[in-house]
Each structure stands twice: as C-alpha cells, then as structure tokens.
Amino acid sequence: MSRLRNRHPRVRVDELCGLFGYTRQAYYQGFRRGYESSAAIDQTLDTVEKIRKKHPKMGVRKLKVVLARDYGIDVGRDSLFDIMRNAGLLMRKRMRHRRTTFSGHGMRTYPNLIKEIVPSRPDEIWVTDITYLHVQGRHMYVFLVTDMYSRMVVGWKVADNMRDDNAIEALKMALRGMNPQYKEMPVIHHSDRGSQYCSLDYVKLMKKHSMEISMTEGGNPRENSVAERVNGIIKNEYLYPLQVSISGLHMRVHRAIHAYNAERPHLSLNMHTPEYVYRTGILTHRLWKNYYPYYDSLNHL
C-alpha cells in the first residue's frame, strides 16, 4: 500500500483501499497498529538494555518476569525471544570450570547428610563453595555460603588465597544475618571435602553454633550442585567479562551478589527472588531435578 501511494500520489487513499477490498479506516488502523508495535519493540529493547546494565547475562524467561514486575511491560515469551533474537541480544552460556578443591589433606571428613532431605524452610541447609576469578594476571577467590531453600547468598568473602580464614569470614557473615525466627534451629552445613571446610578452626566454628556437618562423599559435582550452580550464576552472569582492578573487585562482587539476591527471578523459586523467599519463608515448588532418587520421588508427590 505504501508503495502504491508513492507511485500514485494523486490517487486518493480510499480508491487504493478499494482495490484490496477494505476501507480507508481499516488502512489507518493497520498503519497505527504497525507504528505502535514498532514503538513497543523499541521500548522493550531500551528497557532490556537498562536491565542488563545490572544483570548482563539475564536470559529471556527472567527478562520477561522483570519487564512485567518492574516496568509494567507485558510481552509474551515467544515474542520477547523473537525481539531479542532479531536484535542480536540472545546469550550463549559460558562453560568453563576450574577445580578449587583439594581433598587429599588427611583431615577428618564427614558423611553426606542431605541425600534424603528436602529443605522446608530458610536456614535449614547452607551449602558452600569457592570460585575463582582471573584479575590483572592474578587468581582471586570468592567464598560463598548459600541458603539451599531460597538460593540466597547469605555469606561471602573475596580473597587472593584459599586459606580457611577466608571461608571462616564468609560463614561468620552468614551467621550474623540469620533470620531471627530460625536462630534456635539447627543448620546443616554442606560442603565439598576441601581443606578449608575440614580445617580445625572451621569445624570449631561450626560446632560452636551447633551446626550439623555434611560433606560430599565422592567426586561427583552433583553432590553439591546448588552451591556450584549459584557460583556459576554469580561468576558467569554478573562478573564476566571482568574488567576491574583488584582494588575494585570487592565492590564489583558486592553489587553482583545484591543484584542476584534482590532482583534476579529464579525459575526454581516460581520466579521469585532469593531474598524474597529467604525473608518471607514462602512455600516454593521445586522445578528442578535432584541427583538423589529419593529427592525426585518427593518432587512428584
């Protein structure tokens, strides 16, 4: 229609519309819808760009939730996927892993206590892990303590080494921030068999706070999958590409953890944020598979 109008500028719009069997009003309504659709796409892309300044690797499903929740933009998942794909904004997952566990240390280890436990509240099970960052030619390490029920990072520490005192600082942060209503209830502390978590000082701190000690029993990463998954999100969705100095790394990690805890919707939490679930203790429905068959049988009850 636009081409015909350009070729025949003296022919009235209603005459051209008559050639195709529709009215002048229908033509202008269609034109307006096309304009509004284009404007809506531009608004969506502008808002996605704004969101990704804080959540650089957020995918389509989570962007859909944040667009509706925080900006009132209600767009279908498939439509948003098409918009993102056409704009070249779809993300590829980063698949890199570096071993940070040394279990041949000869210190006492503990059995895995969480094989047949489905957490029913916050501060029931904490899982821990260490991830590394390459900054200005040096390896830096982030020690994380995560609440298994809510997926919230409750304690963390950035360090230039893997000594147990850094793991202790992360655990102390988690203990200080415990929800008051659960402080008198026991916490199961689950980790791999790394020397940091088996050290005398670390075990002493756990026992001081009446924590039950649980550790992985083999080399299968699925035995500590929640901790490794959260570490991967923090590292790959928020910290890479890592263009920061060593002196600025602490603040960068702080902002990343805040964005993850307080703003990023979580599929396994019915698209709530970890902080919301941790603070409210609301019931969530597990939407992920577990390594242990007992877990999976409970998930289908």
Segments the model singles out, each with a brief description of its role:
Residues K57, Y71-G72, V118-S120, V135, ...:
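Conserved, non-catalytic sequence blocks in retroelement Pol enzymes and Pol-derived host proteins
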Residues L200, K207-M211, I233-L301:
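C-terminal domain-tail junction helix/linker
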Residues C17, R24-P122, N220, T273-H285:
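Basic, flexible linker segments flanking DNA-binding modules
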Residues I73-R77, F81-L144, I168-M173, G177-P186, ...:
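Mobile-element integrase/transposase regions
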Residues T101-S103, S191-R193, S199-K204, I213-K235, ...:
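RNase H-like two-metal-ion nuclease catalytic core shared by retroviral integrases
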Residues L16-C17, Y27, V48, L63, ...:
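Mobile genetic element proteins and their domesticated derivatives, centered on retroelements
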Residues D147-M148, V158-R163:
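A short acidic/small-residue loop/turn micro-motif
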